[in-house]
Amino acid sequence: MVRVKICGITSLEDALMAVEAGADALGFVFHEDSPRHVPPEQATGIIAGLPPFVQTVGLFVNRPIAYVNETAARCRIDLVQLHGDEPPEFCAAVERRVIKAFRVQDITSLDPIKHYRVAAHLLDAYSPKAYGGTGLTFNWDIAAAAKEFGPVILAGGLTPDNIREAVEAVNPYAVDVSGGVESAPGRKDAAKVREFIRRAKA
């Protein structure tokens, strides 16, 4: 069964709602340019209120390695998601398991993947304007092809309306959603979250 990560959590209320709906992991965005940015102290408080067996993921974009490791330790997050231009040697210096994001334009976007030794590869749609959270989709056949390099987390424009089709097309290790289940940036819509998870795991 595919696993589901709900990203862009900004409140304990949304976090607990997502867990109750069946989310396997929650994402916290430590990228100040994002409308879903959450300060480390706020994330720490939310994470402290979570029940056991829920994985937490911290998302970083081109931050210094010291900041990544210090924030991960301070907030007690389980995995680090690197969504910028971080090279393989940067990933190797992270003191948590790493999910490396790759922004997909075409099949050549997979070329760098083989150089990374990480826990999973997250595939998101390319946009020249942002490092993620754009709501754009990409060719899911490329995501299916990426599975030969390791576990794939499918992201990019996923919604309750297209998640079933996406899972059937790719059969990814996990799916990642943010804007597709929101009523406003950083505010999750409970009905959308429940429907997304139900269809993803159907």
UniProtKB/Swiss-Prot annotation:
Pathway assignment reads: Amino-acid biosynthesis; L-tryptophan biosynthesis; L-tryptophan from chorismate: step 3/5
The answer to keyword Hydrolase applying to this record is no
What's the domain of life for this entry?
Bacteria
Q: What is the lineage of its organism?
A: Bacteria, Pseudomonadati, Thermodesulfobacteriota, Desulfuromonadia, Geobacterales
**Which catalysed reactions does the entry list for this protein?**
N-(5-phospho-beta-D-ribosyl)anthranilate = 1-(2-carboxyphenylamino)-1-deoxy-D-ribulose 5-phosphate
Q: Name one GO molecular function term.
A: phosphoribosylanthranilate isomerase activity
State the family it belongs to. Belongs to the TrpF family.
Q: Which InterPro entries match?
A: Aldolase_TIM (IPR013785), PRAI_dom (IPR001240), RibuloseP-bd_barrel (IPR011060), TrpF_fam (IPR044643)
Entry-linked SUPFAM superfamilies: Ribulose-phoshate binding barrel (SSF51366)
GO BP field: L-tryptophan biosynthetic process
What EC number(s) does the entry state? 5.3.1.24
Q: What is this protein called?
A: N-(5'-phosphoribosyl)anthranilate isomerase
User: What keywords tag this UniProt record?
Assistant: Amino-acid biosynthesis, Aromatic amino acid biosynthesis, Isomerase, Tryptophan biosynthesis
